[in-house]
Structures are given as C-alpha cells and as structure tokens.
Amino acid sequence: MRVLLFLLLSLFMLSAFSADNLLRWHDAQHYTVQASTPLKAKRAWKLCALYPSLKDSYWLSLNYGMQEAARRYGVDLKVLEAGGYSQLATQQAQIDQCKQWGAEAILLGSSTTSFPDLQKQVANLPVIELVNALDDPLVKSRVGVPWFQMGYQPGRYLVQWSH
C-alpha cells in the first residue's frame, strides 16, 4: 500500500515538479512552485545520512534520491541504517562513526521520536532532519513530505478514477 501511495503522490507531483522545479509547502494544503538553480559542490562535502532502515520502499526510495543527488552534485555521502525503529543506541553509535569518518553534517532520519543529548553528541555538526521530526532546537532544517497531501492526493485520484 505504501508503494501505491508513493506512486500516486508522485504522479500528482509530476505536473508541477520537474528537474527544474521545487514545491515549497506553506502548510498542509498550500504550496508554491519554485525554480531550482542547478548546483555543483565546490568541493567534496562529506555528509552522513542515518536511516531507521533500508528494508522498506519508503526509505529505499529516499536513499536512491539521496545517492543520485550526491553523485550529481559531487558530494561524498555515507549511508548508515539502524536496522529498524527504536534503535537510539545504534544511531548514537552511528553518529560517532560519522564523526570519525569526518562528516561535515548529519542527515538524520531518526528511528525514535526523541534523541536525548543530541547537542552533546554532535557538538558543532549541523543536523538536518530527514522525514521524522524531532522538534529539537539543534536541528538546522528538515526535509520531509507533506503528510496531509500524501494521503489526500492518492484518495482524490482514486475517487476521480472510480467515476
């Protein structure tokens, strides 16, 4: 079912989204289309992405996009997966691995709803949330999906398709 929802949402987005456009969501129901500027990293940034798992289509598709973007922009991306949800200790150990590797930022798809002592652990490394919100003031930015639209658009499509 997740795959179907993802595909339907992707189809909805195709009309507004292309390689040159971004959707900026203002709230659950309103977005504007913004042109994106093609970028190339001036140096090989070292980014470390932590995912709860790579066992389902959602995180696999996110990882595919991240890998493609890293390749396209000339960024060195290290990916670690925690083996499932509720794996705080695993992800804390992975942050240490990222720091030893020389990561310049952490892209955190948290496996838990809170991440105690995140500030102490990452020190000055920027943290960008991937999908799962922590609501931690340390987090610099968040990349996610509009959850309302993820359900609404496939439902809307199915209603229209059934007529």
What are these regions (language model features)?
Residues 1-4:
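Positively charged n-region of N-terminal signal peptides that target proteins for export
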Residues 16-18:
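Boundary at the C-terminal end of the N-terminal hydrophobic targeting segment
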Residues 25-36, 46-65, 69, 78-89, ...:
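Extracytoplasmic "Venus flytrap"
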Residues 47, 72-73, 141-163:
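Bacterial carbohydrate/catabolite-sensing allosteric modules
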Residues 49, 99-110, 128-130:
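Periplasmic-binding protein-like
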Residues 88-103:
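Short, well-structured alpha-helical segments in soluble
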Residues 113-149, 160:
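Flexible loop/hinge segments that line or gate small-molecule binding clefts
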